[in-house]
């Protein structure tokens, strides 16, 4: 596999920058994982090249690269928690603080344990298990808020 991780000047590639931007918005705990970002960027570039060599159009090759770049990242526990805080705990957590609170919550072992029970596939939000996860997360947030987390 070629080294498409960084440009000669040491900057991230197009795919690396695209993924980094997405991670900042949807998976902030992964945004500092440079190995993960570089590996995914390499795989996306390879998928693009393979598709072009196989006769795919630019649009088809770009779709193949995007599939590889964002695989298993479409569902965001972070964004789910942010929306739970906005929708269920607006009185307890100000809207402008929800993102920071969600980030703190995701770092707690209790949240990692809840999330580990589910197969968080790209289409997880469309599954029946999503409702169960949502309920568990609401309950966990409620308990933590009652115990003084703010």
PLM regions: where:
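C-terminal alpha-helical interaction appendages
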Residues: 2-150
